[in-house]
């Protein structure tokens, strides 16, 4: 009887255990968690090679049993193959695995990884469950197996890339391969850089020289390119930071901006969104990586330069306009500058609508303006702000049928109207050349700029060539804006004055040298002022001295505008050079001349409907104030008769066609003019 009872008991125990053991067969094992730089890195051993979905849970108390999952937070899910570096494996044609830790061992094909970004400070525990394809989630929890037993302290911080390996890319150049796992949550230190968590994005670092030769170049690839493209810009010993604008679907890339919150990164069938919001995920990731590189490598943060062709050129233009405080200067070749303008372009709206929606809808973004305004460089160039815009050296082709030529005209107009400076070259080239100029020969121009040194933004030079109307048959076939005038790099930037030596400049083409003009006028706006700090509304004095004979040929007063800009218009530049001095009234050794002409200021350089115009009259006599188009035709008169002091005028352009317009003020034989751009 005893033996019979024992046998029955064994059968009963096996009957109870077998279903339990079978249920546990889907449980992951070896769960490990490490927290650093605001992210928790979870790895585990998988129950099988393929066909699994994993769910990641967290709680502030230990997860010991299935019932504990009820109160736990589901932070994410992932599928098979997270151990495998799909991007690099495809690029190199061989299998690569991720490493969780810098210089740590690569994961094996029986492991998985998930990276969770912390959104609060505190202690956490984690558990991971598995679900086989066609089955249900196995919610078994075994402490120390698929649930962490060790208390983990998490804190909010900016995520950092993890070093993976060294790769030889070209000519014995060694690129340090890093991976930044994405976050879809905004924190105080870093905005979301994807709409999914734990997606691996590559970046690369090519180590360069120590100080003082520690220049950093930001290398942005063209559409369809990759982070392994790290061509040297000036020297093979330059530091280089590469990025990867990569979408694992037919849309290829986000044009260095981002995509809709509901966009599926791995789908080829994304529908065009009609509602919701577009976010600058890629832009946020790029800015974060620039900050990481300048903080963690021995590079000079004052000498960071962006460089790129095609979509890589677009990267530079929009970086200069939106994050100009992070880059000293930008070199851009054949860039797309308006993602809503496809005139004379092989690109077309349907290529981008799954990411951004249709231009007619113009969905909102997380950056304060509709998406197609944010992706229009002319709009960004016209934004009135104290925010720094980096200088741009740009090349465009009038016969470029990939990105199109017509889009450049409103952008050029906005840059000039808002006195942003930079140089804009063009010739008759297509997207890949050849043309009448050598774009590569201008790369060296960006090296004169530093983030910690003032420079003069030159605009509206009288010797500018004519880019035309956007029709490739109109305007000059080869030309440039503001390339016919130059300055001496020894700029005076003191507490009481700012000075620069201006001089005419010759233009190099493939057919020879275009001689420098013997005389020109140009608008000058000091940028990145270090010591000559002035406040809006301050009245300053200026003089222009002809260097050939030392004569002060012209001078006057200029008012600091609401955005702290000092804009001196129509400065004469002579063959032997002109020294422009801007200073506080009453500086020792400098006279205090009376105002010689009216002062004009407008609250925005690009006007959509209305603008506020300010005028300061130098005397008390008869005065005129009128609006003109580019042909010189007077459209409206705001003032005719005696005037004195200061006045504000509301300028309504709602019924005016888009284009460039001038306001001219005259009194006592002296006049001043101001130009702005109208867009609708």
Question: Can you describe what each PLM-predicted range is?
Answer:
Residues 338-445, 449:
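The feature captures the conserved acid-bearing segment of alpha/beta-hydrolase catalytic domains
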Residues 584-614, 618, 679:
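Residue-level detector of functionally pivotal "anchor" positions at catalytic/ligand-binding pockets or at interdomain
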Residues 267-298:
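Alpha/beta-hydrolase active-site loop
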Residues 55-122, 134:
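Recognizes extended acidic, P/S/T-rich segments that occur
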Residues 166, 170-172, 176, 417-579:
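Alpha/beta-hydrolase-fold serine-hydrolase catalytic core, especially in secreted/extracellular enzymes
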């Amino acid at each position: 009887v005893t033996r019979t009872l024992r046998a029955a008991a064994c059968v009963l125990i096996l009957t109870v255990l077998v279903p339990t053991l079978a249920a546990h067969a889907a449980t992951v094992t070896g769960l490990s968690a490490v927290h650093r730089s605001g992210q928790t890195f979870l790895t585990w051993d998988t129950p099988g090679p393929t066909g699994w979905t994993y769910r990641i849970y967290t709680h502030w108390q230990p997860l010991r049993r299935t019932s504990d999952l009820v109160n736990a937070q589901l932070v994410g899910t992932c599928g098979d193959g997270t151990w495998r570096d799909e991007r690099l494996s495809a690029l190199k044609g061989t299998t690569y695995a991720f490493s969780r830790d810098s210089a740590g061992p690569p994961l094996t094909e029986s492991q998985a990884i998930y990276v969770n970004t912390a959104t609060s400070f505190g202690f956490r525990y984690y558990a991971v469950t598995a679900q086989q394809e066609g089955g249900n989630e196995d919610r078994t929890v075994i402490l120390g197996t698929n649930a962490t037993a060790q208390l983990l302290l998490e804190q909010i911080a900016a995520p950092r890339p993890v070093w993976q390996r060294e790769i030889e890319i070209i000519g014995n150049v060694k690129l340090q391969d890093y991976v930044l796992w994405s976050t879809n949550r905004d924190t105080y230190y870093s905005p979301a850089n994807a709409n999914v968590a734990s997606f691996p994005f590559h970046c690369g670092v090519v180590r360069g020289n120590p100080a003082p030769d520690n220049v950093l170049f930001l290398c942005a690839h063209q559409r369809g390119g990759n982070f392994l493209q790290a061509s040297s810009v000036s020297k093979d010993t330059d530091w280089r930071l590469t990025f990867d604008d990569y979408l694992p679907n037919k849309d290829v890339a986000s044009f260095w901006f981002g995509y809709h919150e509901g966009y599926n990164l791995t789908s080829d069938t994304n529908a065009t969104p009609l509602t919701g919001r577009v976010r600058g995920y890629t832009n946020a990731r790029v800015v974060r990586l620039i900050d990481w590189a300048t903080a963690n490598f021995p590079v000079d943060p004052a000498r960071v330069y962006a460089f790129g062709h095609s979509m890589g050129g677009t990267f530079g233009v929009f970086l200069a306009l939106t994050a100009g405080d992070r880059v000293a200067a930008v070199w851009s070749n054949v860039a797309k500058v308006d993602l809503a303008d496809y005139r004379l372009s092989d690109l077309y709206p349907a290529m981008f609508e799954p990411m951004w929606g249709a231009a007619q809808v113009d969905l909102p973004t997380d950056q304060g303006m509709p998406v197609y305004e944010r992706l229009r460089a002319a709009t960004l160039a016209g934004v009135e702000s104290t925010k720094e815009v980096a200088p741009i050296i740009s090349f465009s082709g009038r016969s470029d049928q990939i990105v199109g030529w017509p889009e450049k005209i409103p952008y050029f107009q906005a840059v000039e109207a808002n006195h942003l400076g930079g140089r804009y070259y063009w010739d008759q080239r297509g997207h890949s050349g050849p043309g009448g100029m050598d774009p590569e020969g201008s790369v060296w121009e960006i090296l004169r700029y530093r983030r910690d040194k003032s420079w003069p933004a030159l605009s509206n030079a009288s010797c500018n060539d004519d880019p035309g109307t956007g029709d490739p048959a109109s305007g000059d076939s080869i030309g440039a804006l503001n390339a016919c005038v130059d300055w001496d790099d020894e700029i005076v930037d003191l507490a009481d004055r700012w000075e620069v030596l201006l001089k005419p400049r010759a233009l190099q083409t493939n057919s020879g040298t275009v001689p420098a003009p013997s005389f020109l006028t140009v608008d000058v706006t000091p940028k990145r002022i270090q010591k000559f700090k002035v406040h809006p509304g301050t009245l300053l004095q200026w003089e222009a001295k002809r260097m050939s004979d030392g004569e002060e040929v012209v001078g006057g007063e200029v008012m600091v505008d609401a955005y702290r800009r000092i804009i001196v218009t129509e400065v004469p530049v002579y063959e032997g050079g002109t020294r422009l001095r801007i200073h506080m009234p009453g500086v020792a050794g400098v006279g205090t001349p009376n105002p010689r002409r009216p002062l004009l200021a407008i609250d925005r350089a690009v006007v959509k409907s209305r603008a506020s115009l300010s005028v300061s009259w130098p005397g008390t006599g008869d005065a005129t104030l009128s609006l003109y188009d580019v042909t010189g035709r007077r459209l409206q008169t705001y003032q005719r008769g005696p005037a004195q002091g200061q006045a504000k005028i509301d300028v309504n352009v709602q019924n005016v066609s888009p284009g460039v317009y001038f306001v001219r003020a005259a009194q006592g034989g002296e006049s001043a003019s101001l130009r702005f751009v109208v867009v609708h």
